[in-house]
Design a protein with these regions (language model features):
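Short, surface-exposed polybasic-aromatic patches that bind anionic ligands, especially phosphate groups
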Residues: 210-291
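Alpha-helix C-terminal capping segments
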Residues: 15-19, 77-81, 135, 162, ...
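Ordered hydrophobic segments in well-structured contexts
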Residues: 3, 22-24, 53-55, 88, ...
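Functionally critical loop-and-helix segments that line ligand-binding/catalytic clefts
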Residues: 1-10, 15-16, 134-213
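Substrate-binding cleft of extracellular glycoside hydrolase catalytic domains
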Residues: 1-115, 138
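Short Gly/Pro-enriched loop/turn and capping motifs at secondary-structure junctions
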Residues: 94, 124-127, 146-151, 175-178, ...
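Beta-rich nucleic-acid/ligand-interaction surfaces
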Residues: 124-136
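Aromatic-lined carbohydrate-recognition surfaces of secreted/lumenal glycan-active proteins
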Residues: 114-127
Length: 291
């Protein structure tokens, strides 16, 4: 899924004209800042059927508070969005090295809502600060890394390597995004999941968005991985629609980690001979995407 994140800098952006599967909106900062365009953008995104996230910027300049103070301020101002949007801590302010502060904020929001927020920062901070406490808390990671940061449209790059976090939920890969319908730069993001996965992060119960738990494994529509063994070994991933050959061991680790994080169990795994694979392809009219 491709999406954008916006703040008051994009006030008035018409989301009906900008292509995006999701939009993440700055809601609050510190103990006193409220984005004046947040609710307008939120309501438009909701009416358009977009997936939504809302974030709090920690230690907004001049409005710094304790984790509990800022958490309470955030929740007070987004109470109408709970259950409709992913809740997020943007951690890149003056206290960006204070992992205990971040963990306390995330824990506070989780305790008050029963929903685990995402944690946002950038790779240079993540990989030079010990955020293992946040990772062990099972908070989803939204990570930023821009590289050369040249003007570009959507792409779906692999996530950067991150210390402690086995799974990247969302990757912000440029702040120089250019999309139709908006005359200016936008932050562009890729979410490594589908709409059902997004809804799980929002906090919707799994029985609201997926079939009953007693459904048996269906190799025609359910996610699974399989290994072909004959001479050399090849690993493939089926995402419910398309079969992909994996070219990098880190891809397999990412898929397994994401599936376990969302579903609370290991992704189904099969071992096939090439002959069995050919039968499957012919029976269900599947065409693999080879590396």
């Amino acid at each position: 899924m491709n999406g954008i994140d916006i703040s008051s800098y994009q006030t008035g952006i018409d989301l009906s004209k900008v292509p995006c599967d999701f939009v993440i909106i700055k809601a609050t900062g510190g103990t006193g800042y409220v984005n004046p365009d947040c609710d307008r953008a939120f309501q438009q995104a909701l009416s358009l059927g977009k997936k939504i996230g809302v974030y709090h910027f920690a230690h907004e300049k001049g409005l710094e508070g304790t984790p509990e103070q800022e958490g309470a301020f955030f929740l007070k101002n987004i109470k109408g969005y709970i259950g409709k949007a992913i809740l997020i801590l943007d951690f890149e302010g003056s206290n960006q090295k204070d992992s205990a502060w971040a963990k306390a904020f995330l824990d506070y929001v989780y305790k008050q809502t029963g929903i685990k927020p995402w944690f946002y920062t950038y790779t240079a901070n993540l990989n030079t600060t010990d955020f293992s406490n946040v990772a062990k808390g099972d908070y989803g990671l939204w990570i930023a890394e821009y590289g050369r940061n040249l003007p570009q449209g959507y792409s779906q790059p692999s996530p950067p390597r991150t210390n402690n976090f086995p799974v990247v939920a969302c990757f912000q890969y440029t702040s120089s995004g250019r999309l139709s319908g908006y005359n200016g730069n936008l932050d562009l993001n890729v979410f490594y999941g589908d709409q059902k996965t997004w809804d799980l992060y929002v906090g919707k119960k799994s029985d609201q968005i997926v079939p009953p738990e007693n459904k048996i494994f269906d190799a025609t529509s359910d996610e699974f991985i399989f290994t072909l063994t004959k001479g050399s070994t090849s690993v493939f991933y089926f995402d419910g629609k398309t079969i992909f050959e994996l070219s990098d061991p880190t891809q397999l680790d990412h898929i397994r980690g994401t599936y376990n994080h969302i579903h609370g169990k290991e992704i189904p795994s099969l071992v096939w001979t090439p002959e069995q694979f050919d039968i499957y392809l012919k029976m269900y009219d599947k065409k693999p995407v080879y590396k």
